[in-house]
Every structure is written in C-alpha cells, then in structure tokens.
C-alpha cells in the first residue's frame, strides 16, 4: 500500500504541474511533509513513535497515538478494540521504562501526574504507581521483565505487524486501486515474455533436433537411387565404393562445419566429377532445374559406355550381383557412420548438379554453423541486429532490470532509449546542454534513468513520460559524475564524483597522478544526499561501482588501483586492497558473490576472494583491445583515443561465461581455473571499429549480448544456450 500511495502522490503532483495549479501543489507538498501517517509506511510510523519516546515527549506521544486512533484504529471492528487497548498500554509502559533507564525522574513523575485520572481505575496500572519510589525497579520481580531487551523487541515487532496487517486490510479509494492493476498487467507482461522466450527456445531446440535426425538418417545419394540403377551403373557404384573405402572416414560433426573449417587431413575432390555423380546427374536431369542442366553440360566425365565395356569384360554378371548384395549389407550395418562417410565433398560446379538431398545437407551445415560447431559450443548465435541511431562513439550501453529496454550514451551527450523486442524501436531521445558522462537504470521503478553530467549534476529522467523529473546538484568541486549504481533493494543510489583530470577532452587518457573524488549516497525519493563514504588513504576518483543482488555490499574500483568493498548496512568500508598497477576500469560481483572480478589498466582480468582480503583466486591477461584505452585510426593521420567508461565485461545468467570487448566485436570465454586460462567459445564479430562497452541480459535459455563500438554502432546478438 505504501508504494501505491507514493506512486499516487507522484502522479497527483505531476497532474497539478501539468494543469498549472502551483498553489495547490505547494499546499500538497507542505501537507505531505507534515503527514502523520507517513504515507502509510509502517517503518516511518515506528521511527516517529520511538523518536517521541527517546525525547521523553509525553504530550507529542499522546497526540500522535490519538491521531492514529482517530484516523486508523476507528475503522476496525469492535473485536479488535482490546488489541488496540493492550498496544496503548504497552506503549505507555515502554515510555515509562525508558524514562527510568535514562534516570529522568521528572518525566517519570510527570507521566503519573498527567495520566493518574485515566489510569488509576485500571487494574493493570495499580502496581505501576509505585515505580518512581522503588530504588532499583529493574531488579524488582514485578518490573524486571519490562526492563529486558526481549520484551522491548517483542512489543515493537507486535506493533509493527499490527500496523502492517491493518494497512493491508484497509479499504482503498478508487484512485489507489490503479497500482494493483498496474502490477497485474506488469506481471502478465513478464509472464508473456517468459513464455515467448520459452517457445522461442523450444522451437530452436526442435529445429536442431530435427536437423540432427535428418543427418543421422540421410543415406548417400547413390543408395537412394539404387533401385533405378542398371547393371552397368552398378559396376560404376562398386568401383566408386572401392575408391571411397580407401579414404579416411569422417567425423559426424564434420557435416556441421563449412568447407573452410574441415580437418586438413581430408583430401578435397578434384575439379572433375566422378563417374557415379555424372551418371546420377543424367538420371535426374529431367527433375533438376535449368541451371543444373547447364552445369551438367559443362562437366565432361569419362564415357560411361567405355567404362562399362571394360568392367563387363573383366567381371561376370553374377559377380556384379554379389557385389551389389554385399554393398547393401555393409550399408545397413554401418548406419550413421556409413552415411557420413559416403557423403563426398565436391567443388562448386558439381554441387549445383547434386540431388535435392545434398542440398538439404548443405542447408543443415549452414544453420548449425551460425553458432559454431553444434554440440561443441555452449551457445548458438541465432541472430545479430544493429542499432545505428548514434553518430559518435558509445560510452555506456545498459539493459534495464526487466530486459525490455536499452539506454545508450555517446560522447556527444546524446542518450537513446530503445526497445528490441519484438522490433528495434527508439522510445526516447535525450539531448543535454551539459556533457553527460554516466548513466544507470533505477531499480524501483525501472522506468527511471539516472544521468550523470560533467558539471556536477545528476538528472532523474522518466523514460515513459519522456521528461526530466529532478536535477540534483551533487558537488561543484568534483563536477564529473563518473559512475552511478542503484541499490537493488531501495530507492538510493551511489554516485562517484571526481575533479577535473586536466585532459582537454573527456575521451583522452588521464594523467599519472590519481584524480581527487568523492563517493556519495543519494535518495531518489527525498532527492537529498544521505551519506559521504570515507575513502582511505585519501579522496580519489571512483571509476566503477557495483552492488550485489540485495544491495548489502558495494564494490568500487578507483583511479589509484584499489578495490574497496563497503558494507551498506553499516555504511562503512569493510575491505580494501591494491588490485592493479594503474587504474581499475571495471569491477563486478561473481555469480555466487563470493568473489569479485576486475579489469585494470595493467591489462589483467583478476578474480578476488572477498573472504580473504587481497587474495587472487585467478588471473588472466587480456589484450589492449579488451582493456583500453581504445584507439580508432583513420585517413590522413586521424586518431581517436577513448578511455574506458562503461562495463568492460559481463557475465551470463549462470556466471560460467564472460563477454569482453575486442577490436571487431565481442568475445565470449568460459571461466576456467587460473592455470587453464580463458577458453574462447564464441566470437560475436560484425563491428568495423573497436568495441568499448558490453552488456549481457539473460532470459530463460535465450540471452541478449550488447556490444557497442567507437563508430556509434551497437550490435545486439541473440544467443541460445545449449544444455549439456
């Protein structure tokens, strides 16, 4: 209910601004600030009650409780009135115990003076009037239980639960019921998307299985036409069979590979067709296309009649029939391996006159080659699309939490919000007067986008309404907002602000000395700074930030090469260690969140154990194409250099594979032990300029990989995960 109230308040505020009712908006804001129900947020109400108790404000406590009874408890049925009375009694006793614990005798006596008329007739308060006169009430058997921490916690939890259930059961006005409809529609859309992805994955698996079965059960072309062969042609089959037996047998998966990727041990056929192929070509000439007829005329094999005459003089008719029967037995005894063995390679000219079954086999090879060698690869690349709305180098490219939209930022400060399902379509274009350096999707709600600028401000942009909701001034001394990270569990976000680096352009490499900076915590609801983190040994620019799944941990990589791990429950640094020689460019939690991965200026891709400070679990060396700075060269000595700003690597849904940048696309590696190194499993090529940032969004068995390059092009590759 609290979220629905907050959302409704925002919508009403937006409507009043749209209508120009500024005075009404001012009254609304002032009343929201003094709202005693705190937007029906139980945690805020509990905080207010405890604040009044800790300040020993008896009058304020009575007025606040009376307001709750007048606004909330009066709507309850009579059967719940004893519960409300018991909670009020426990609240007053909680107040009294606090005054005794802080040794504020005046407040203790004041309570009994003001409440004497109301409480002296109640039997449960009869013994409590002696409380101010007992020297050590915490040791008295009548009061010792109330001084225990267990009783206080039990009371607070009971009151919290009572208010929570009350808010859930309260009848809602019609205006507030929209939130349940929005949640229901959103849930249906998510279920729809998951089912669509499931159907898509099942269709891909079904197509692969069907194609595999076709390869298993496909017979060699000469066997399919065996019934139509005459005696003379059987002799040619036998002679061709003897030639084929001398060649090494093929592996079954070689049928999935294109001609260029097959094993070098195989000898390619000559430019001249075999007698069998030419004979079959003439037998099927009536059913083939005109192009096949033309090519058949170009190929001039040896005369069939002359070869038949030679074979007939050396082999009797009975021997030919025996060879024929032996041929059939050998065929059916070696079903799958024999079928792939008898399938012969041919040059482009002879492929045109092959029967239809050979064309099907060629199609099968093409489909499986989309993702590599079929079962040998963990992913199959189903498709690759290009988004080309940007006209300069990309800095950031991120998919939102729902996996439906993408936000991309280029060096000109242009932000594009676009969808790729079911079709690629631009939803919003954001152009800022000030240069933009960073972006991040908000976790709740996921329609909001945070944009960090180079003049010390962060904008909160609504991608649905296509307008800026707020512009927060972060720091004038540290105007460059290098990194943004939203907490998955709330409305707060972490902001990294840095001083000017001294470079002429943002895309130029930074100097050797670490740049000064701050790490701040802000709230998108209150639009206020909550905290400034302490950075040891001194203030330094934080290049990258990342939360774990529940927002309890925050990992950062800085310009001084140090990785810092923060406890977000205590808002303090838990660990820090020197990770790289030079700056830390990108950092992420692993799938199980027991380790942290980082890429630094030294070209190292390192896995760190967060339970053992500074201990490397694995280390890999990457090329400059994957680390940066990225260089784009052109004609007449043109050269563009860009330092890393976005994510340099991203994991799949199970954390077993990682996507990195390269000069022509993205590379997917399998994470092995340190001594085994990174194992390349798939290359997502297609770019003509260096890729500078990547992202990987997984849904069901299908994953979407984003690779963005310096020429403004973004490639969207759809992958199908193959289950082992």
Curated annotation (Swiss-Prot):
Ranges of biased composition (kind: Polar residues): 270-279, 303-315, 349-365
Membrane topology value: Peripheral membrane protein
GO function term, MF aspect, one: phosphatidylinositol 3-kinase inhibitor activity
WD repeats mapped onto the chain: 389-428, 431-471, 499-532, 537-576, 579-618, 641-679, 686-724
Subcellular location as annotated: Early endosome membrane; Late endosome membrane
Pfam families documented for this protein: CTLH_Armc9, WD40
Keywords, alphabetical: Coiled coil, Endosome, Membrane, Phosphoprotein, Repeat, WD repeat
KW Metal-binding (keyword) present: no
UniProt keyword annotation of Coiled coil present: yes
Residues recorded as bearing Phosphoserine in the entry: 274
Coiled coil: 178-207
Bias kind Basic and acidic residues: ranges: 322-333
Annotated segments matching region Disordered: 249-365
InterPro entries: ARMC9_CTLH-like_dom, WD40/YVTN_repeat-like_dom_sf, WD40_repeat_dom_sf, WD40_rpt, WDR91
SUPFAM superfamilies linked: WD40 repeat-like (SSF50978)
CC per GO annotation: cytosol; early endosome membrane; endosome membrane; late endosome membrane
Family: Belongs to the WD repeat WDR91 family.
Function recorded in the entry: Functions as a negative regulator of the PI3 kinase/PI3K activity associated with endosomal membranes. By modifying the phosphatidylinositol 3-phosphate/PtdInsP3 content of endosomal membranes may regulate endosome fusion, recycling, sorting and early to late endosome transport.
Protein name: WD repeat-containing protein 91
Species name: Danio rerio (Zebrafish)
Chain's gene name: wdr91
């Amino acid at each position: 209910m609290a979220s629905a109230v907050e959302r409704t308040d925002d919508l009403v505020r937006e409507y009043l601004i749209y209508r120009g009712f500024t005075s009404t908006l001012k009254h609304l804001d002032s009343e929201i600030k003094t709202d005693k129900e705190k937007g029906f947020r139980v945690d805020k109400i509990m905080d207010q009650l405890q604040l009044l108790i800790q300040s020993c404000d008896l009058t304020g406590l009575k007025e606040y409780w009376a307001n709750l009874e007048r606004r909330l408890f009066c709507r309850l049925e009579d059967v719940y009135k004893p519960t409300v009375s018991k909670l009020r009694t426990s609240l007053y006793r909680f107040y009294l115990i606090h005054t005794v614990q802080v040794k504020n005798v005046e407040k203790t006596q004041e309570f009994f003076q003001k409440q004497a008329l109301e409480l002296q007739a109640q039997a449960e308060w009869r013994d409590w009037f002696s409380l101010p006169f007992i020297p050590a009430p915490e040791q008295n058997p009548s009061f010792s239980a109330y001084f225990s921490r267990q009783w206080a916690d039990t009371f607070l939890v009971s009151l919290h639960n009572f208010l929570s259930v009350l808010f859930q059961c309260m009848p809602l006005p019609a205006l507030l019921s929209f939130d349940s409809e929005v949640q229901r529609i959103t849930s249906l859309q998510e279920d729809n998307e998951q089912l669509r992805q499931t159907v898509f994955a099942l269709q891909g698996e079904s197509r692969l299985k069907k194609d595999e079965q076709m390869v298993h059960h496909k017979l060699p072309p000469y066997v399919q036409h065996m019934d139509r062969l005459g005696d003379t042609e059987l002799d040619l089959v036998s002679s061709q069979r003897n030639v084929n037996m001398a060649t090494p047998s093929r592996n079954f998966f070689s049928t999935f590979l294109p001609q260029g990727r097959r094993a070098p041990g195989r000898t390619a056929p000559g430019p001249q067709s075999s007698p069998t192929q030419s004979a079959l070509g003439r037998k099927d000439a009536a059913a083939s296309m005109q192009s096949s007829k033309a090519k058949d005329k170009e190929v001039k094999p040896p005369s069939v009649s002359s070869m038949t005459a030679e074979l007939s003089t050396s082999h009797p008719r009975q021997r030919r029939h025996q060879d024929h029967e032996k041929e059939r037995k050998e065929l059916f005894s070696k079903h799958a391996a024999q079928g792939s063995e008898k399938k012969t390679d041919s040059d482009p000219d002879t492929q045109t006159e092959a029967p239809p079954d050979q064309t099907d086999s060629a199609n099968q090879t093409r489909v499986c080659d989309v993702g590599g060698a079929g079962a040998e690869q963990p992913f199959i690349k189903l498709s690759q699309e290009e988004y080309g709305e940007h006209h300069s180098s990309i800095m950031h490219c991120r998919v939102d939490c729902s996996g439906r939209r993408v936000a991309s930022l280029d060096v000109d400060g242009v932000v594009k919000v676009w969808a790729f399902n079911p079709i690629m379509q631009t939803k919003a274009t954001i152009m800022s007067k000030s240069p933009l350096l960073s972006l991040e999707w908000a976790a709740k709600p996921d329609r909001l986008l945070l944009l960090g600028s180079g003049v010390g401000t962060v904008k909160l942009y609504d991608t649905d309404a296509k307008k800026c909701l707020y512009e927060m001034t972060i720091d004038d001394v540290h105007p460059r907002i290098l990194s943004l990270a939203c907490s998955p569990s709330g409305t707060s976000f972490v902001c990294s602000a840095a001083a000017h680096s001294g470079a002429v352009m943002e895309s130029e490499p930074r100097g050797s000395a670490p740049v000064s900076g701050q790490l701040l915590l802000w709230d998108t609801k209150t639009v206020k700074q909550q905290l400034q983190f302490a950075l040891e040994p001194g203030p330094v620019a934080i290049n990258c930030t990342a939360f774990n799944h529940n927002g309890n941990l925050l990992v950062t990589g800085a310009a001084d090469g140090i990785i810092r791990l923060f406890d977000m429950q205590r808002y303090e640094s838990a660990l820090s260690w020197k990770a790289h020689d030079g700056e830390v460019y990108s950092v992420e939690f692993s799938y199980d969140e027991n380790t942290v991965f980082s890429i630094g200026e030294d070209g190292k891709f390192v896995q760190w154990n967060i339970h053992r400070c500074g201990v490397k679990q694995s280390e890999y060396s990457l090329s400059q194409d994957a680390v940066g700075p990225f260089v784009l060269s052109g004609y007449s000595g043109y050269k563009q250099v860009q330092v890393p700003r976005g994510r340099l690597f991203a994991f799949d849904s199970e954390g077993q594979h990682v996507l990195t940048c390269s000069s022509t696309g993205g590379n997917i590696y399998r994470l092995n032990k340190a001594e085994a190194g990174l194992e390349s499993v798939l290359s997502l090529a297609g770019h003509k300029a260096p890729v500078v940032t990547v992202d990987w969004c997984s849904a069901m068995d299908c994953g979407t990989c984003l690779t963005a390059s310096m020429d403004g092009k973004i490639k969207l590759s759809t992958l199908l995960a193959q289950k082992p």
